[in-house]
């Protein structure tokens, strides 16, 4: 009989091992990115971030429909929106040319996404409920951050980009962002 002394402990041990293995299989483990797919995934994550930024920044000038700013600030904001609008169009073109290129891969941690959404909401409220010089300063400060981030992101993407056409675009876009960044910083400083 298997209930006699020898089989019972062994049956218990086997059962315990099966339970441990089953429970261990239930834990969530982040997916492992295959080595051959990792560069494309990193590239797509970068392009996703750049595309999202270009989409938002291409609309930055719309705030001037409901808020007043000086002619100098308004002109700069409209130029920035145009630069990002053209970048978004180019990115759309690249995606059409290469269906392997995806702009839907931000994969930011949940806390990062929530933090960014909270910052965006607060910034929008601050802009909408300010006026005059305070509004202009807040608006320009948002552009200092966006342009700095965009130029660095585009440069990082350009360093990793194997496609010469996209690499050239990213390099030029980064330079445009750097130029506008300098202009906006001067405007913030009273220049």
Feature-to-residue mapping (PLM):
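Sec-dependent bacterial lipoprotein signal peptides
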Residues: 1-26
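His/Met- and acidic-residue-enriched segments that coordinate or traffic transition-metal cofactors
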Residues: 26-191
